[in-house]
Amino acid sequence: MGDSSLTYTNKRIKKKVTNDYILKEVLKAEKKIAERGVKVTTGRVIAEQTLGFWNSFYETHHYALLAGEPCRVFKKLPSGYGRKEINDIIVQVRELRNRINHNEHICFVNRKCDFSYVKDMYTLISNFLTWIYPEIMPSLRKVDKVCKIIDKEENKQKQ
């Protein structure tokens, strides 16, 4: 993405800067795929992207350049939902991932075991995936053990 709208003057350093994060991430993914000795395809480049990439992709400045096309991937996006809601969910998932990576508690509130945040995030992620591919959750349920583990742990807490 080399559009002029991605160039701005950084007030702190008083220099023109180009926001080429998306371009750099795509090129990095292509290089990584090629180094594995496999054909670089659109699907592989997409699969290689991080939550940071998707967060930037759905930010206003990049989204506007693509004239709303990124939302078309969400075949079952609920009425009234759009770029902002999608990006808000990506941010929440990224925050959850970061909390887990930094060993922060996700199942405790006031030193008591509480799975409400985890359950809410599970529902949010499940819904999000369903908006892209409605048949995904029945397929994932065969290998998904999240709800069973939460139920088991909640039952332990009640004893």
How would you label these PLM feature ranges?
Residues 1-159:
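Amphipathic alpha-helical interface elements
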